[in-house]
């Protein structure tokens, strides 16, 4: 069996394909979705989206929050923004992480600290996405 996965943002369609399974970051933690999953509507948290293709290859994307609906082997993810892991430059992601870490330690005031921590979280997620090692089949 397979799942139909659609990942949409206001700017573009990120994904429209049949897959075997996904691992999705939600506000209550990560969930794995296999065929015949119980219907669910859930908020999507900032985090990685792991996609297992029909050929058992794994791909990674990064979601920047949104909403997901899973019903009848169809997964529709409406995201505020998203990136495919293959579009993320590993060196650039690592540099952004180092800059974000420095900005947190230099932040002055609550607003600046909150913004720096959000940027740090985003940078960590991007680095995690490009460094993820998929499970062996």
UniProtKB/Swiss-Prot annotation:
The record's Gene3D superfamilies line, in alphabetical order, gives:
6.10.140.480, F0F1 ATP synthase delta/epsilon subunit, N-terminal
Q: Where in the cell is it found?
A: Plastid, Chloroplast thylakoid membrane
Question: Which UniProt keyword terms apply here?
Answer: ATP synthesis, CF(1), Chloroplast, Hydrogen ion transport, Ion transport, Membrane, Plastid, Thylakoid, Transport
Cellular component per GO, a single term: proton-transporting ATP synthase complex
Which Gene Ontology terms describe the biological processes this protein takes part in?
Answer: proton motive force-driven ATP synthesis
Q: What is the first-listed, main subcellular location in coarse terms?
A: plastid
**CDD domains, per this entry?**
F1-ATPase_delta (cd12152)
In the bilayer, the protein is annotated as:
Peripheral membrane protein
One Pfam family of this chain = ATP-synt_DE_N
GO MF terms listed in the record are: ATP binding; proton-transporting ATP synthase activity, rotational mechanism
Q: How does it assemble?
A: F-type ATPases have 2 components, CF(1) - the catalytic core - and CF(0) - the membrane proton channel. CF(1) has five subunits: alpha(3), beta(3), gamma(1), delta(1), epsilon(1). CF(0) has three main subunits: a, b and c.
Q: Which family does it belong to?
A: Belongs to the ATPase epsilon chain family.
Quote the PANTHER family the UniProt record gives. Answer: ATP SYNTHASE DELTA/EPSILON CHAIN, ATP SYNTHASE EPSILON CHAIN, CHLOROPLASTIC
Q: What else is known?
A: A stretch of the chloroplast genome is duplicated within chromosomes 1 and 6, resulting in the duplication of the gene. The expression of these duplicated genes (Os01g0790900 and Os06g0120500 respectively) has not been demonstrated.
What this chain does, per the record? Answer: Produces ATP from ADP in the presence of a proton gradient across the membrane.
Annotated protein name in UniProt = ATP synthase epsilon chain, chloroplastic
């Amino acid at each position: 069996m397979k799942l139909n996965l659609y990942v949409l943002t206001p700017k573009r369609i990120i994904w429209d394909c049949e897959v075997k399974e996904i691992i999705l970051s939600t506000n209550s933690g990560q969930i794995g979705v296999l065929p015949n999953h119980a219907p669910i509507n859930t908020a999507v948290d900032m985090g990685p989206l792991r996609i297992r293709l029909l050929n058992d290859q794994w791909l990674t994307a990064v979601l920047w929050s949104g909403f997901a609906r899973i019903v009848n082997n169809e997964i529709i993810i409406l995201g505020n923004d998203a990136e495919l892991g293959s579009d993320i430059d590993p060196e650039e992601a690592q540099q952004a992480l180092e800059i974000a870490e420095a900005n947190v330690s230099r932040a002055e005031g609550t607003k600046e600290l909150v913004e720096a921590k959000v940027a740090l979280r985003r940078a960590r997620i991007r680095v995690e996405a490009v460094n993820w090692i998929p499970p062996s089949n």
